[in-house]
Amino acid sequence: MPQYQELPCGGQVLDIDTALKDGILGGGPELGDAAAGDGGKQPVELRKMMDELDAAGDGGGDEAVPAVFICPISLEPMVDPVTLCTGQTYESANISRWLALGHRTCPTTMQELWDVTPIPNTTLRQLIAAWFSRRYTRFKKRSADFHGRAAELVHALRGTAVPKRQPLKGQARVAALRELRSLAAAHQSVTKAIAEAGGVGLLTSLLGPFTSHAVGSEAVAILVSGVPLDADAKAALMQPAKVSLLVDMLNEGAVDTKINCVRLIRILMEEKGFRPDTVASLSLLVGVMRLVRDKRHPDGVAAGLELLNSICAVHKPARSLIVSIGAVPQLVELLPELPTECVEPALDILDALAAVPEGRIALKDCPRTITNAVRLLMRVSEACTRRALSMLWVVCRMAPEECAPAALDAGLGAKLLLVIQSGCGPELKQQASELLKLCTMNCTSTVFISKCKLTKTIQ
């Protein structure tokens, strides 16, 4: 039989000695602290603590949340636990919804409920509050320690530390920046402390024509970690000397540095005062394409494609430059090997490049354009199918005698029939119909049927 024991504060709990021994409460005083005050306000405050810990990724600290604190319905920690007559405990709101739907069984045991009145489990609520209060106190202390350390590092780098010292130089500067980057990566709230200590201006000033890549890579990593950048900071980062350093690191740095440079450039492109000609650099575009081609690092591929897509959108003259570095055949070759989430951005770029004459010629001249575009039809998403159809329309319209038969040989006819009969939107079906007419203009029914490999029934 379960052993129930009375607590001085009221309520009952299953094996309270075990709970104390296992450290669920972490000592008697915390239970009293958690239980103090208005009982009605406690769940609200507890929920705020849980939400803040969860947002910081520190829901349980180094320990897992005890299973007894988890609601079997939502699988989340309970704030206002209530117990049914079967002995099972649930979050009050969750079990109330269950009962409101007309259920008269226990969700966990499926036993019939002879009494549907939930009983507030005040002791378990106190246990939960005490456990999360201890986690919250430790979290706040750690946060304060991290914030203080981040501020110390910023002041040491600026030369404003107390007692007064010269700004850190050489390897000491690199080590301090590396520690600051680690703090910002591990604790998102540290980025605010960096900004409050004047870190944004410091990091911006460190980027220049004479900055070593060791310092520059750490500074850029911190800037893209979530440190708030205002308009003045972004304007300073758009200075030619600083952009030149970013381009150099994009071409010569480690993969992580390249990705961070790409992300920082994208952040700058979102600023209203961004000058589009800033990205009209062959060196920058070559560096981005090199990152996109490195299939060993999917994060780099995705970041590079996003930047190229943004450049095509905000600076149309750059499209010809992108074509001139051989981006069209490289992207077409990559299509079958790209992760699913990267296919659509790649097709968006190719669609934008097809808007300039050089891009259309490059698409037609690439031997894999038709094969890879046909393969993508009805494979990834409706948007990808639309972009692939646009590519096929461009090449088949430019050279129908050459490209239309090649497209049918690649299985385009059957794919177009599939698109027309699918649940896609009417515009996409119309696009497929027009492409089908173009490809079958000089093709007999017999030849078309044979190339589509249709069965007699379908014929």
From Swiss-Prot:
Pathway: Protein modification; protein ubiquitination. It is a peripheral membrane protein. GO terms for molecular function: ubiquitin protein ligase activity. Expressed highly in panicles at flowering time, at moderate levels in vegetative shoot apices, leaf sheaths, leaf blades, and elongating internodes, and at low levels in roots. It is found in: Cell membrane. It holds the Pfam family U-box. GO terms for cellular component: plasma membrane. It comes from the Eukaryota. Residues 64-138 form the U-box domain. The keyword Hydrolase does not apply. Its main location: membrane. GO terms for biological process: brassinosteroid mediated signaling pathway; protein ubiquitination; regulation of brassinosteroid mediated signaling pathway. Induction: Slightly down-regulated by brassinolide. Disruption phenotype: Dwarf phenotype with erect leaves and short grains. Dwarf phenotype is mainly due to decreased cell proliferation and disorganized cell files in aerial organs. ARM repeats lie at residues 188-229, 231-270. PROSITE patterns: U_BOX (PS51698). PANTHER family: U-BOX DOMAIN-CONTAINING PROTEIN 31, WDSAM1 PROTEIN. E3 ubiquitin ligase that may function as positive regulator of brassinosteroid (BR) signaling. Possesses E3 ubiquitin ligase in vitro. Acts together with the heterotrimeric G alpha subunit GPA1 at the plasma membrane to mediate a BR signaling pathway that affects plant growth and development. Does not seem to be involved in gibberellin or cytokinin responses. This is U-box domain-containing protein 75. It comes from Oryza sativa subsp. japonica. The lineage of its organism: Eukaryota, Viridiplantae, Streptophyta, Embryophyta, Tracheophyta. The gene is TUD1.
